[in-house]
Amino acid sequence: MKKLNYEVLNESEYKGYVLGKGKAPVKVLQFGEGNFLRAFVDYWFDMSNEKAGWNGKVALVQPIAQGLTKVINEQEGLYTLYLRGAENGEKVNRKRVISVVDGCYNPYDQADWDRIKAIAKSDDLEYVASNTTEAGIVYDPDSSFDQL
């Protein structure tokens, strides 16, 4: 089975909404790349692109050394979200390709760390999201934005 990426998606004749690679600026810096953030928070940003023309991408930051950067980037940030449950009293069982993720970055890699800092300083940045545990965030009173 082929891994999902933009080329495979185009070949599949997928009919849903897709924001192409490099088609929007990174507007969200998200600390955490786990299932909850990608299935909930990133879903809403993806829907904002489709329904409201928000035109933004999300940069993910893995909070610990052993994260999902490689897996996410191999799929160019694309993944399939299964939506199951009830909506307006009706059973829902559908799939949506989420295309809002620009990429995933490993802060333990110097090149990725430099990219994370550049995103943090970008005028395009509108939101910072986080759902990491104490394993992923450490308070440093000596740290300041000027150090970026």
Q: Positions of the model-derived regions?
A:
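Non-transmembrane, aqueous-exposed alpha-helical and coiled segments at domain scale
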Residues: M1-L148
